[in-house]
Regions:
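Proline-aspartate-enriched helix->loop->beta-strand connector
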Residues: 110, 118-131, 147, 247-261
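Alpha-helical, coiled-coil/dimerization segments enriched in small aliphatic residues
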Residues: 217-243, 247
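Short helix-initiation/N-cap motifs at beta->coil->alpha
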Residues: 44-46, 105-119, 239-248
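Extracytoplasmic substrate-binding proteins
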Residues: 138-214, 235-237, 245
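Bacterial Sec-exported substrate-binding components of ABC uptake systems
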Residues: 2-4, 23-68, 175-206
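Bacterial N-terminal signal peptides that target proteins for export
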Residues: 1-11
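A short, structured surface patch at a secondary-structure boundary
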Residues: 66-120, 128, 234
């Protein structure tokens, strides 16, 4: 009987030890759940994209949209990389005094030709990238390394407003983006009410993309803005394209009343 008791006690002790060891092993194998919460944002092409619920490091390829994100979000804290030309909207402008963080944004990940250095973007911890809607190849490459992408565009006022809402959803600032669109609609109605396009004596307005004399006002919402504002776009009928350029001699010939650009590069044309 004593031997049986001893064997039983030994067996129970062994089982307890095995159980303890298994418990330790299970605890060691358990890793903290680091899966980030996500949400779905539908971009301008209708792609349903899973993005971080709380996006923190955004790369923005479209030049003016770095400023758009600042306007919707209220700061540049969640911006990480921007197009080099986008910095021209910051340096020497009112934004320079309001947001010191903007000056620290990376301007090398995104090249002048709008391409994205995929490896650098991944190393920089970019968690979402905003691209023009024609950048499908860049979007595919970024997605493969785990960086979700949203495609936007501003060829028409409708797509411009949709893109505002897309960015608002990304930032969790849908109401603010909607208010910006409402403000646009209100202002637009006031301008249209003046029916300035019916004037016979209209100023000619040349709108350029940059100092390389690439056209802009003929292939995006600026064409409509020029029209309802009472201006005449001499290149309004030119087939829209991102690479469409004109010669300086052509500008002399047209002698437009107004030359404008969305970017600071236009300053180079003053002379």
């Amino acid at each position: 009987m004593k031997n049986w008791k001893k064997l039983t006690a030994a067996a129970l002790a062994a089982l307890a030890l095995v159980g303890a060891l298994e418990g330790c092993g299970n605890n060691a194998d358990k890793k903290p759940d680091t899966k980030q919460a996500t949400k779905i944002v539908t971009d301008l092409k209708g792609r349903e994209v899973s993005v971080p619920q709380d996006v923190k490091r955004i790369a923005v390829v479209p030049i003016p949209w770095a400023s758009v994100i600042y306007a919707i979000d209220g700061s540049s804290e969640r911006l990480a990389a921007i197009h080099p030309a986008a910095m021209s909207a910051y340096k020497g402008k009112f934004l320079e005094n309001r947001d010191k963080h903007f000056a620290q944004l990376d301007t090398k990940i995104i090249a002048q030709n709008f391409s994205v250095n995929i490896e650098s973007a991944a190393q920089a911890g970019i968690d979402t990238a905003v691209l023009w809607q024609y950048q499908d190849k860049d979007a595919e490459k970024l997605t493969k390394v785990g960086i979700p992408t949203l495609l936007i565009y501003n060829d028409t006022v409708e797509n411009l407003k949709k893109s505002f809402l897309i960015i608002g959803k990304l930032l969790g600032k849908e109401e603010r983006a909607a208010k910006i669109n409402e403000y646009y609609d209100t202002t637009n109605k006031k301008i249209i009410a003046k029916q300035a396009w019916e004037k016979t004596d209209k100023p000619t307005v040349l709108f350029l993309r940059n100092a390389k004399l690439r056209l802009q006002g003929n292939d995006n919402f600026m064409h409509e803005a020029i029209r309802i504002g009472g201006g005449e776009n001499p290149y309004g009928q030119v087939n829209g394209g991102r690479e469409q350029t004109i010669a300086m001699e052509e500008i002399y010939k047209q002698n437009p009343d107004i030359i404008g650009s969305l970017y600071n590069e236009i300053a180079h044309l003053k002379n």
